[in-house]
Amino acid sequence: MEDNKPVPPQTKPLDQDEILKTVMKEIEKTYGKGAIMKLGDKSNLTIEAVSTGSLLLDEAIGVGGYPKGRIIEIFGP
């Protein structure tokens, strides 16, 4: 005897890039523009910063040092 269970509709799996963009939009909506900053991105926002003491690192961070009032994470080799 066959099961007459309804078949769920097929949905297109979300692309990782789409998921990331959606999450980033939600974070910016909740916490404000500039809440997520990528290393090396130039920002048009005026953000007060504390120098790291390294001109190269300050330039790489993008705002001239560690941004004040924000949680930062730097990782890598």
Swiss-Prot record:
> Which GO annotations describe the biological process of this protein?
DNA recombination; DNA repair; SOS response
Q: Which gene encodes it?
A: recA
Q: Which Pfam families match?
A: RecA
Which family, according to the similarity comment?
A: Belongs to the RecA family.
The record's subcellular locations are: Cytoplasm
From the record, what ranges are coiled-coil?
none
User: What is any one of the record's Gene Ontology cellular component terms?
Assistant: cytosol
**What does this protein do, in the record's words?**
Can catalyze the hydrolysis of ATP in the presence of single-stranded DNA, the ATP-dependent uptake of single-stranded DNA by duplex DNA, and the ATP-dependent hybridization of homologous single-stranded DNAs. It interacts with LexA causing its activation and leading to its autocatalytic cleavage.
Please name the InterPro entries in this protein's record. Answer: DNA_recomb/repair_RecA, P-loop_NTPase, RecA-like_N, RecA_ATP-bd
Query: Which protein, by its recorded name, is this?
Result: Protein RecA
Keywords in alphabetical order, please: ATP-binding, Cytoplasm, DNA damage, DNA recombination, DNA repair, DNA-binding, Nucleotide-binding, SOS response
GO molecular function annotation: ATP binding; ATP-dependent DNA damage sensor activity; single-stranded DNA binding
Main location as per UniProt: cytoplasm
